[in-house]
Amino acid sequence: MTNNTKTITLNLGPQHPATHGVLRLILEMDGEIVNNADPHIGLLHRGTEKLIEHKTYLQAIPYFDRLDYVSPMCQEHAFALAVESLLECEVPRRAQFIRVLFSELTRILNHTLNIGSQALDIGATTPLLWLFEEREKIMEFYERVSGSRMHSNYFRPGGVAEDLPDGLLEDIDKFIDQFPPKLHDIESLLNENRLWKQRLVDIGVVSQKEAMDWGFSGPMLRGSGIAWDLRKSNPYDVYDEMEFEVPIGKNGDCYDRYFVRMLEMYESIKIIKQCIEKMPKGAVKTNDPKLTPPTRAKMKESMEAMIHHFKLYTAGYDVPAGETYKAVEAPKGEFGVYLYSQGVNIPYRCRIKSPGFAHLQGLDFMSKGHLMADVITIIATLDIVFGEIDR
């Protein structure tokens, strides 16, 4: 007796809400079982790397907010570190603490969205509503410090744009005190929930070897049991002064990756607490006039200061010739910036390494043999944002 069954081809996205952006996924299905998953990218390509080649180093910063628009400050951080490496400039300690503080707030901002939307994709509505309430508070901190809720444009080569407004540290401290009980509530809904575990446990398993071979990083790598975190292995700013653990999983499945992200938020809370306690006084920008604009008070008194300000924001500053690569531990994984300077005021090349690009490549082998519904779970646990994948 011959088997006359044939596979069907199914197009998922790019308009489907569960694809988390403009992912077009071509699935080869044998009934409900996935044989192959072919992701098509590029629908959000905006030529960011090429655009940066025609902007000064200051004008390039806002482009990084628009890559992974869920965790903008972490990407600004990588670019600022790369420019500082070429300039060999000292960053004031207060600015370093502020950067680390907001990088960890950004990590919470990212993970709350991921866990909430992952729960919604699987059918649980409550976690998304609860977590969005907490995200709103963090976005208010963004707005108070930078004037914008999402595209902050706050980090600068040599420091940050402005000092923290009065009362902000106290409000962040209050938020951090009330946030852990909210996380406990989410855990009580999900951790031992029978339906949640049935949808996540043993789904999308990634072994340690596969995670390394595919170039995974962040929670995708740590979920497979590899304790690799750039904040520990290659610390930047004041991360070497912070005490925190690196959560890892055991089985490398969707449940482990969910749990790693949940535990990372508790570690971020520890780091934020330490930043608030240790926050020094002092300047938030380097005192190099080539990099730092004059104050508004000076501009009202001095024509030279006004000219200096105008030149800084139009012509920018020359960066010494050379090349560098700097990476940060962004919420989704290793976000890196390769900069090549020819000694002028615009970069000759700015290559961006986004973690989601490598993670999406692994979707095919992670999905094979699973049900169609499991593909949605795997996409959610990849934590992909197409701003950074398509660039």
UniProtKB/Swiss-Prot annotation:
PROSITE patterns: COMPLEX1_49K. The keyword Phosphoprotein does not apply. GO terms for cellular component: plasma membrane. Keywords: Cell inner membrane, Cell membrane, Membrane, NAD, Quinone, Translocase, Transport, Ubiquinone. Its main location: membrane. Its EC number is 7.1.1.-. It catalyses: a quinone + NADH + 5 H(+)(in) = a quinol + NAD(+) + 4 H(+)(out). It is found in: Cell inner membrane. It holds the Pfam family Complex1_49kDa. GO terms for molecular function: NAD binding; NADH:ubiquinone reductase (non-electrogenic) activity; quinone binding. It comes from the Bacteria. InterPro entries: NADH_Q_OxRdtase_suD, NADH_UbQ_OxRdtase_49kDa_CS, NDH1_su_D/H, NiFe-Hase_large. It is a peripheral membrane protein. HAMAP family: NDH1_NuoD (MF_01358). NDH-1 shuttles electrons from NADH, via FMN and iron-sulfur (Fe-S) centers, to quinones in the respiratory chain. The immediate electron acceptor for the enzyme in this species is believed to be ubiquinone. Couples the redox reaction to proton translocation (for every two electrons transferred, four hydrogen ions are translocated across the cytoplasmic membrane), and thus conserves the redox energy in a proton gradient. NDH-1 is composed of 14 different subunits. Subunits NuoB, C, D, E, F, and G constitute the peripheral sector of the complex. Belongs to the complex I 49 kDa subunit family. This is NADH-quinone oxidoreductase subunit D.
